[in-house]
Amino acid sequence: MHSPKRKKLTPADLAGLTVAIVGTGREGVSLARMLSAQGDVTLTAIIDSEGGPGEEWDREFGRTIPVHVFNGDSDLPEGIDVAIMSPGIAPHRPLFQVLARSDIIMTSGTDMFMAVYGDRMVAVTGSKGKSTTSALTAHIISAHGVDVSWGGNVGIPLWDIRPADVIVAEVSSYQCSSLTSSPMVTVVTSLFEEHLDWHGSAEQYFADKLNLLAHTPQSVIVGGQSQILTQQMDLLYPHLPRTTIGEGSTWSVSEVGGEWHITRDGHTVMACSELPLLGHHNWWNVAIALEAASTVTTIDTDTAITALRSFHPLPHRLEPVDDPSGVVFINDSLATNPSAAAVALGSLRDRRVIVLLGGADRGVDRTPLRQELTAHPPAVIIGLPASGEGLLRDIEQWCVEAGVTPPACVPVSGMDEAIAEARNRARAGDVVLMSPGAPSFGQYRDYEHRAEDFKRAIADTRP
């Protein structure tokens, strides 16, 4: 593949140029809105789909910005100086490669945003935990009276974020891959194989994810519970100073007197049971967020405790769903890979669990899920399409090889059947966890659509 011609640019640098926005999804709309308001840039858009630019783009711009449909080979509009790539355009796609072979300078909305706001930015990434950690960080900073905004890869495009004194943003591996600058503070929560269809390999995914750290950030904070993250940091950035949570960090998680606590300099601050977040992994996210917040403001312990108690968990991340039956339904639809599902199951080992697994199979490493299921088998596994039936066969074989009795494994044709089976097999106090460990495409628009279907099926069968 060809390497693109990249250059660190700000919106002001685009004055008088012809700029192509490549991709007309949410990020593309946000960029076009910002550059249209600037008024001194000639805009066009490029897509590689016959489906058109999408409803949001049409509603916002109509025919005011021309949209070119890429048909392959060297089919690009003439006169383009700069192409701003949307995160969804993977490097292996023909459109990306044609642009990379051209003389057009390529950048991204994320790189431009960091060029402008990086010196006031706390950027959070990670294979798991980045949304919760970024939201917690912003919540804690705000509680201390600091003017802070939050957004990014949480449904709020970077260029739609209010330019506050401190900006906390979640960034994805797609966004990190092309950066030519780093933010003031970089946070990496965890690392495991993900999005191999976009990045091409696990090694490239790790490198792209950690490219967030490549351009001398002032502070680097990493989670200490991810062995792969530690290994990759040692491999790729061995001389970069970093704070590892749980290894001499100010904030940590410790077991004291048989109960887990958030600690500050080794002293207990609050019991983890007081947190409005499920799961041991989320306790570590709290410690990461406190450490990140402390890079931009002095943390008052009492203020931090009050902020943590008032935090509202984000939807689709171990989110309880109300039900009068006494069965605890939990929506973890954002668990789109096996490692995330393993983390969710690991946080509920003290409960009788019926878990819904399955979706689109991307061929990622399932070792963490295999280890969790064979070490701590749930009571029942319900296999969702399309991968569920095959996954159940594999799980039964894993258990046989591990010398453990396989749990009840039930393939289903869809969500209605899954919830009906779960209700038939659950009793009061049990947990019915949807943590699919797979993406939703092929069955749903996205993980949010899958979560909506889960909640609908629960509501439709309430006693």
Model segments located where?
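N-terminal leader/targeting and accessory segments in enzymes
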Residues: 1-108, 384
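Nucleotide phosphate-binding/pyrophosphate-handling subdomain across enzymes
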Residues: 3-4, 8-18, 30-34, 270-379
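Phosphate-binding loop of NTP-binding sites
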Residues: 36, 76-78, 87-241, 293, ...
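Short, conserved loop/helix-junction motifs that constitute active-site signature segments
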Residues: 39, 179-182, 212-217, 235-237, ...
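Short internal beta-strands
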Residues: 44-49, 221-225, 354-358, 377-386
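Beta-strand->loop->alpha-helix junctions that form or flank phosphate-binding loops
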Residues: 45, 70-71, 107-112, 236-256, ...
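C-terminal helical cap/extension that packs against the catalytic core
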Residues: 56-60, 65, 367-429
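Extended acidic/charged loop-beta regions that coordinate divalent cations
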Residues: 64-68, 73-76, 164-198, 231-274, ...
